[in-house]
Amino acid sequence: MEPGSDDFLPPPECPVFEPSWAEFRDPLGYIAKIRPIAEKSGICKIRPPADWQPPFAVEVDNFRFTPRIQRLNELEIVVEEGGYEAICKDRRWARVAQRLNYPPGKNIGSLLRSHYERIVYPYEMYQSGANLVQCNTRPFDNEEKDKEYKPHSIPLRQSVQPSKFNSYGRRAKRLQPDPEPTEEDIEKNPELKKLQIYGAGPKMMGLGLMAKDKTLRKKDKEGPECPPTVVVKEESGGDVKVESTSPKTFLESKEELSHSPEPCTKMTMRLRRNHSNAQFIESYVCRMCSRGDEDDKLLLCDGCDDNYHIFCLLPPLPEIPKGVWRCPKCVMAECKRPPEAFGFEQATREYTLQSFGEMADSFKADYSNMPVHMVPTELVEKEFWRLVNSIEEDVTVEYGADIHSKEFGSGFPVSDSKRHLTPEEEEYATSGWNLNVMPVLEQSVLCHINADISGMKVPWLYVGMVFSAFCWHIEDHWSYSINYLHWGEPKTWYGVPSLAAEHLEEVMKKLTPELFDSQPDLLHQLVTLMNPNTLMSHGVPVVRTNQCAGEFVITFPRAYHSGFNQGYNFAEAVNFCTADWLPAGRQCIEHYRRLRRYCVFSHEELICKMAACPEKLDLNLAAAVHKEMFIMVQEERRLRKALLEKGITEAEREAFELLPDDERQCIKCKTTCFLSALACYDCPDGLVCLSHINDLCKCSSSRQYLRYRYTLDELPAMLHKLKVRAESFDTWANKVRVALEVEDGRKRSLEELRALESEARERRFPNSELLQRLKNCLSEAEACVSRALGLVSGQEAGPHRVAGLQMTLAELRAFLDQMNNLPCAMHQIGDVKGILEQVEAYQAEAREALASLPSSPGLLQSLLERGRQLGVEVPEAQQLQRQVEQARWLDEVKRTLAPSARRGTLAVMRGLLVAGASVAPSPAVDKAQAELQELLTIAERWEEKAHLCLEARQKHPPATLEAIIHEAENIPVHLPNIQALKEALAKARAWIADVDEIQNGDHYPCLDDLEGLVAVGRDLPVGLEELRQLELQVLTAHSWREKASKTFLKKNSCYTLLEVLCPCADAGSDSTKRSRWMEKELGLYKSDTELLGLSAQDLRDPGSVIVAFKEGEQKEKEGILQLRRTNSAKPSPLASPNTSSSATSICVCGQVPAGVGALQCDLCQDWFHGRCVSVPRLLSSPRPSPTSSPLLAWWEWDTKFLCPLCMRSRRPRLETILALLVALQRLPVRLPEGEALQCLTERAISWQGRARQALAFEDVTALLGRLAELRQRLQAEPRPEEPPTYPSTPAFDPLREGSGKDMPKVQGLLENGDSVTSPEKVAPGEGSDLELLSSLLPQLTGPVLELPEATRAPLEELMLEGDLLEVTLDENHSIWQLLQAGKPPDLARIRTLLELEKAERHGSRARGRALERRRRRKVDRGGEGDDPAREELEPKRVRSSWPEAEEAHEEEELEEETGGEGPPQPLPATGSPSTQENQNGLEPALGASSGSSVPFSTLTPRLHMSCPQQPPQQQL
């Protein structure tokens, strides 16, 4: 495939390995195991086990680095076509233009040639050194220097300064600056100051100061420039090397100096070490042509003051350039400076991991125009190689490469004192796969190098982004490398096996010859990137892989590899060397010698260091070191022999390991010497290895001498120690083989075998098959000894030994054979033989006893016990055990079935049958089993009968159950269901006794007692006739209570029936009443005992109930009086809002009532919102027709308001209550509610009698007569157009005239004085009556009667007591009208009631219309919908949260249940019989009530019968 092709074909995948946990525990062992397969590919990938996930240990916040800049299109088209000269020679510029996609024609090739020659070609000439060929070079500018190796190792490593910690000597000193020569400040040195060398012009060579002005002969400089500080160093051979001390480039130096505020008089210089050289005579002649003519064309170098004709330079310059100019030699010298990074330039910005990741992800997302995680790896790979080959697109990326882990921290946990590690981190910190640990493992060669070689022993970190790449290279010293990707996107690798390394180098040289001509070791500089397809097209085998997070990639010795990153990631890499690497390491040194490349460490020193301590070496490593050492000694002998043949006999010992690396390097091949080197007395600054003895110097051989580390006699001694160490395994293996095979006929003792195993462990022999056999033999022998000791101790333990640990007779014999076959002697064999003899004797005795059956059970049992003490299972012992078990089973059956024995359970019987199946068969056993089975069958049948009786829905009478129990008594088995049936029958008898006792008592039974008996009777599995009677009584009692509840309780009432019937116990506490009203949970109501203050036992005594009720009446009255005083002291909501008081009224809604719309309760004197409570209706009284009935007076309007806290029930009429009492008399059950109802009735009748008595007084009768006369006079007078006014009589009621036709309709809607109006019964147009009432209010005057205080006070007290009664009485209404007539009309309340009624009617009509529309829509759709909910038609107060708002509907239901008994009516109007009686006198009307047809005396005997012991004065 051509390099310029757009399609990239991925190479085949490299091998991928997934080790098991057992394999993964030995890293280098596993790598050695896969090496035969993976080495053929050069690289491989290893996926650790899924559970191996090391934590990321880098301190992210403190991790800062500066990446390198990479440009992807470094190999360009011209280089690919063979270079500038080749293209010009073959006239291929048109081909170049075609490859650059320019259109043919138009002389594009010529234009490209001119641009290339002007811009790029000078750089290529500089790179190749062609512009220095004709230069009259100084002695150091020779050909050898041009090809001298540029120190870089991997160049990126060289650009990073070594660690501040223990650096390995050679590398650390190589990168450290030379020892600083003496520096002098010219200003401070008077001798130097006299020289006056500040201006332009030639300077003395010895001072090393150069003139800055390159246009020396032109005087057009605009101002003085500060000359750069330069250093002239004299080399050992008299050479002079000019170096700039500034690390910046020339342009940067110029820019910095031109802006520097420092004066141009301060210089730093280095004094020469040797002043014996001849003085340099400066002349203004061209260094190329050695002529001085045409001085206007002479160009002065700003670095070395050499002169050049601009036309002599290659390529020539058209004119003298402006600014700083350096000659080719100075440019070459500057570029050869070791401290400068070769390869990719360093970026200027410092990144953190977060900022670099944001930059990397942003770049990739912008470049690919899609999310970074969605870009396919194949697409990135193709795009990368397209960009590498492209010259049109200049894509620049940054790569955080070669970051020193010692300074920035490793990605793996490291065991150091900086921070405490968790147990999980500690595990990974010591793992062999931790890249900080792997290079220094015991099997690794690098662990024998003390110094931390950066990049080899100390890992480096790599932070990559998309397209950031690493070029084709092999590792230093051809070592292994391992790379772990901690996290991030994949890293793509390409690898070439070591067998094809030279082939790859040849292809590279063939494709880019110019680069390799100038730099033979180009592939060692990590700056060469070539398309894998190009290599494959030339026959180089290439493999690839994508390394994902958590995976390892291993490169093998001399395996070329390269790759790039798919995106933002973080990797870590390190080198390691194993025993198999040693031959490759030696070959690498020879290869470095040919390339004159520096070594990272001395291979000879490493071998000798390992050979000096052979006992510390791994056995395989010792064998490999011995082999390498032998080759090295042979070569050393040959080289030293060549020295003798040359006549060099002088020698001295030298500890080369103590010398810095740069002081023991061969000046020819740059190899680091260790075993020996050749030096010269006259040239002390240089030495050579023994392979280049002819390249040291020109001095005589007599002046040269050998510097050696070891003598030729010491090297064989070291070699011998290695051999002993390497062959020690063979000696040991021979001993082990003889011991295991018993070749000499003598079994070794256990101690001898343990000594051999201990020797292998101490000398770290490899885990071979022979060692495993020895360990297995020892393990087996120790197990046999332990088992034999256990056998002996088991006999001593006797019957207390664990049964599961016994061995069989066959196992005992096999165990003895095993001990005899082991290759070691054990004295426990005799003990085992003795036990075997005892067991065989016992076996013979047991056989004899079994042959003479039936034997006595005692004899069999004794034999069995003796066998157990032996500790060995004998087959005959099992037969003895079965015979003993048979005898025991028969005895147990006999005891169980004996008549005198305790009855056994069914489980016991079944257990005996199951156990009998496992005993030895015999006729006696069969007979016993048959008897057991028959008995068990009968018992189960009766048990099933009892179970059916207990579980059946149809309960059986007690007589039936008694018969079943009697028949089951004859079975000698304990039957649980029969026993349960007995217990149920006993409970039934006890229950019947309790029923008889409670029914025959002095009093009727209480409902709670009956309910308890019913609940118990229902749970009994016995048919009870009495239960049905009790259930009927309880049902009747519940029905009566439900009927009473409907009569008294409002819908959703928060009170219980008993609470309503009893006096209000908390009438004096406003807060308690109010909180009770707000309570919605019925489960929190007070119990009966709390209401009456009696115990459960006292509630069964009717006398106690009556006494408690009487006490409750008194407490209720006292409480309400206290509450009235408290509430009267509260400010009125109708008063001024500025009135401030700590005690304010609170409505049932929880808010403070204020302003118009507030009503005051006539009983408790508290204030409420009119919209939150049920209010009276003004026109609640029935009306005559306009022609027959007079108008009502204002005192007859219904303005009386009782709050829901005082009016707790519906307050039925006395007639309804008497009907309930009649039904109660027929109940044979006592209820707390019934007795409370009797007390309430007696209290109401008592109050009614007192009220009638008060109304019958003469003064009261006279007042009532006046009201009757006034009513008659109003009836007889004609109706005027305007309502008349009178000072002492009530105003006429225009509503009675104008809307008399509507009164029957209104009367039908008003029940019990309640204000609830049903929208079905009110026409939408009604409302004129309310308007008439509103217009009449300003003309109302009063009072119409004058009530003396002596008359008013008793009536008000009676009114108070009557309002406390939860019963409606006509006398209450009469007293109310009389009191109202004696007071002025309450206009504020009347207005409030009118406004509330108007608002209510308006809301009812709106809801009625909406409901009618909904009903019509449903009918139109054809659906048969139910009638809308009643709550939707009721007014706002009905739908409120207060239960009283919905009592109207329940009152209608109450009428139907009580036979048409309606709510209480007010005092009859004129024209009725009662009115006629009142006109003639009130006495007849007060003498009888509408409900007096049922005298109370007929009801009281029930209550009196309940308490015959009470004295007459306490009875009602």
Swiss-Prot record:
| JmjN domain mapped to chain residues | 14-55
Q: Where is the composition biased (Basic and acidic residues)?
A: 142-151, 232-242, 1294-1304, 1420-1437
Q: Which cofactor does it need?
A: Fe(2+)
Catalysis performed (reactions): N(6),N(6),N(6)-trimethyl-L-lysyl(4)-[histone H3] + 3 2-oxoglutarate + 3 O2 = L-lysyl(4)-[histone H3] + 3 formaldehyde + 3 succinate + 3 CO2
Q: How is the cofactor bound?
A: Binds 1 Fe(2+) ion per subunit.
Which key words are in the record?
Chromatin regulator, Dioxygenase, Iron, Isopeptide bond, Metal-binding, Nucleus, Oxidoreductase, Phosphoprotein, Repeat, Transcription, Transcription regulation, Ubl conjugation, Zinc, Zinc-finger
Placement of covalent cross-link Glycyl lysine isopeptide (Lys-Gly) (interchain with G-Cter in SUMO2): K164, K188, K203, K233, K254, K1086
Where are its TM segments located?
A: none
In the record, Phosphoserine modifications are located at S246, S260, S276, S852, S856, S1318
- Where does it localize? Nucleus
Zinc finger regions, C5HC2: 666-718
What is this protein identified as?
Lysine-specific demethylase 5C
- Which organism is this entry from? Sus scrofa
Annotated gene: KDM5C
